[in-house]
């Protein structure tokens, strides 16, 4: 099965994705990372109002295989978290990009340097192909 990597997202080396809509960023984990992790059993996410800092951990995801930290692709304030995933973390495996997002963040200061640390979908496809 070929995994999808939507073109409207930016990706990190650590496999998080970011979808920008003005000053609001939706953050989740790529289909590749979720496929590698296997069945997701627990998700730890920040609360609304919490600050996240680019490059630092903002939560963790636990599967039957491993526990992995989640890294912030941008800095900002959490304005929403996907409560449905807290109750049913396995949902992230079913649809990581639409229903399986983790948090929404009001971005502090988005600049080109910050986005330079991310990859396009095509660049990300090439990276994950090299990992296999």
Curated annotation (Swiss-Prot):
Cofactor: (R)-lipoate
Modified residues (N6-lipoyllysine): 65
Gene3D superfamilies to which the protein is assigned, alphabetical: 2.40.50.100
SUPFAM superfamilies (UniProt xref): Single hybrid motif
One of the Pfam families matching this protein, by short name: GCV_H
UniProt xrefs under InterPro entries: 2-oxoA_DH_lipoyl-BS, Biotin_lipoyl, GCV_H, GCV_H/Fam206, GCV_H_sub, Single_hybrid_motif
Family: Belongs to the GcvH family.
Subunit and interaction comment: The glycine cleavage system is composed of four proteins: P, T, L and H.
Job description of the protein: The glycine cleavage system catalyzes the degradation of glycine. The H protein shuttles the methylamine group of glycine from the P protein to the T protein.
NCBIfam families: gcvH (TIGR00527), PRK01202.1 (NF002270)
Protein name listed in UniProt: Glycine cleavage system H protein
Organism (species): Picosynechococcus sp. (strain ATCC 27264 / PCC 7002 / PR-6)
């Amino acid at each position: 099965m070929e995994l999808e990597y939507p073109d409207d997202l930016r990706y990190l080396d650590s496999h998080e994705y970011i979808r920008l809509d003005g000053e609001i960023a939706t953050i989740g984990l790529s289909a590749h990372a979720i496929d590698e992790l296997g069945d997701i059993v627990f998700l730890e996410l920040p609360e609304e109002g919490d600050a996240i800092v680019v490059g630092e951990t903002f939560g963790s995801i636990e599967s039957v295989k491993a526990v992995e930290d989640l890294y912030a692709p941008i800095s900002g304030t959490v304005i929403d978290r996907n409560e449905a995933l807290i109750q049913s973390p396995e949902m992230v495996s079913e649809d990581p990009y639409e229903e399986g997002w983790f948090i929404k963040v009001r971005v502090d200061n988005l600049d080109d340097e910050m986005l330079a640390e991310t990859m396009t979908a095509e660049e990300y496809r090439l990276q994950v192909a090299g990992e296999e």
